[in-house]
Amino acid sequence: MKIQKRDGRVVPYEEDKIRKAIHKANNEVEERYRASEGLIEEILEDVQQEGRQTQTVEHIQDMIEEHLVEHNKYTLAKKYIVYRYQRSLLRKSNTTDESILKLIRNENKELAEENSNKNTRLASTQRDYIAGEVSRDVTRRLLLPEHIAMAHDNGVLHFHDADYFIQPIFNCCLINIKDMLDNGTSINGKMIESPKSFQVACTVTTQIIAAVASNQYGGQSVNIKHLGKYLRKSREKFAKQLEDEFGDTLDQAAKDKIVQMRLHDELKSGVQTIQYQINTLMTTNGQSPFVTLFLHIDENDEYVEETVQIIMEILRQRIEGTKNEKGVYVTPAFPKLVYVLDENNCLKGGKYDYVTKLAAQCSAKRMYPDYISAKKMRENYEGNVFSCMGCRSFLSPWKDENGEYKWEGRFNQGVVSINLPQIGILAKGNEEKFWKLLDERLELCYEALMCRHKALEGVVSDVSPIHWQYGAIARLKKGETIDKYLHNGYSTMSLGYIGLYEMTYLMKGCSQTVEPGKEFALRVMDYTKDRCAKWKEETGIAFSLYGTPAETLCYRFARIDREKYGDISNVTDKGYYTNSYHVDVREKIDAFTKFKIESEFQNKSLGGAISYVEVPNLTNNVEAIEEVIRFIYDNIQYGEFNTKSDYCQVCGYDGEIMINDNMEWECPQCHNKDHAKMNVTRRTCGYLGENFWNAGKTKEIKARVLHL
């Protein structure tokens, strides 16, 4: 006989546990009210002879109570019922008081290190975290089925963003910025008309970004090409002003020169507005907006030359950096820059190679931009090229009523991630057991994902006018539900995964870079991808496989499994699990081989994936970056460079600030260890982080080896 526990797990029946529970209750009452050993054995025998192959914990508890009452053991039954009720209350009791008070006193280390772009000492950020703690508590106690909540607690799966689940908001999106700029929008009840100049368009764009960020919990992306139209408007405005002012008294060459000077000033000012506004704005999420600028030189666009000018200025300003409070230029975390490589700019003699060369300089100094290969992306997404939503989440192809592909104005409903290493730990190399456990846990993930979906059903557009009424996603009427955007593949649902390396090592004794590990890991990817396709076919919801960034989860899952299963070499003893399908950060492998191997996994993880290579300071060897960029174009859809970009405010050192043997960040020159007196920027997952990291992620960062 098997027992189905409250978290959904099915475990072998152990009658000793029932015997001990009744003995515990016996000890709480006078001897005359106690159950005899004979009665206890009778209860155990009846449970065994019930005839069911699988019993629930609740059903067995009901049987015990019935037996005690039938044998007139009312006092004992009452004690057992009260005990059972108290346990139920305990599971549903408020759990937030201590964590919130510790947060306010700056003593909650776990929360402080949860997000490397949130500073928990700030009152504004604390407000978000306090709300988040309440949301987590309500979600766990009241909103999720108990077995899903238990599965989350036990590290079977991770129900992402529970700190926002009580609100009817979604994860990430591609803003339909073209519609909002061209047709106007409304923010905070104030109409914003279509801009008449580039500077105003940049200002409005940052206002839209802030409003969108405050009404969702994940990242967002803006295709910068839609600003090209407004740069041309500024050029036309300046030309008309000169014509009105000087008429024929100035020759055309002089007029063109003045127009170009004024346009350059406006271009610089507009881009500066975007960079500084995004890095200084504080959303209701207690942080700068998680936003990506998509830099795509699309020659089919009539404003392509204006787009090139904007991209060049964005890259120039990013190379310069932003000033910290000491007035020193440092690497900003936002906005994330994603640059598209195509036939016209892939460093093979294309028309726009000069833009890519500037992008390479920028990556060498500031880590961004990251690179998308249009060539590989078209192979994966029915000939289309489009931005990720924020860090790495990609939409599935969808066509409107006219048969046209649509990307902007779509979104992701949410993410649930599966703990692959835990399955490997429990399977102990037995493939039959592995696939059985994977099946069971995928069904739990599906149920958890449907909780997210159902939480959005019936939501009306009024909850976020910027999204639903004024163009970021749609132009619905007030009071209209958002339901039509939740079905038929318009928006996506993500099944995330973490620790493919650890899972492979546990099952095959090697990494996924060699056989038999690689074949097994790819089979697991195919299996989970196919399961997403099956769910999509059954529900009409666009489920997709997503390589989880795992900023916090890399530590959380590893910590849970270490507590449950002890130190396991190369798995739990490291203190972290590896991001998604990535090669073990400690493995000595060159950049080209790493990208080549990981590209096979990227192609199966089309709901979200990004690969990186760790490089030294290459500001004096940009040609090495360019060589890898050429390789990215032909071999992998989405790649990025990790380098170091640090500054010690005590001594002025601007080399790499190291992690010492005590896992402390320390300036190698003056030995400063004060986080408040140093600027450290590292690749956290797909985004950069600059507010330091949890213990697991810090260990992972320290363990990274160079690939060039």
Question: What are these model-predicted stretches?
Answer:
Residues 18, 22, 227, 231, ...:
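Buried hydrophobic packing segments
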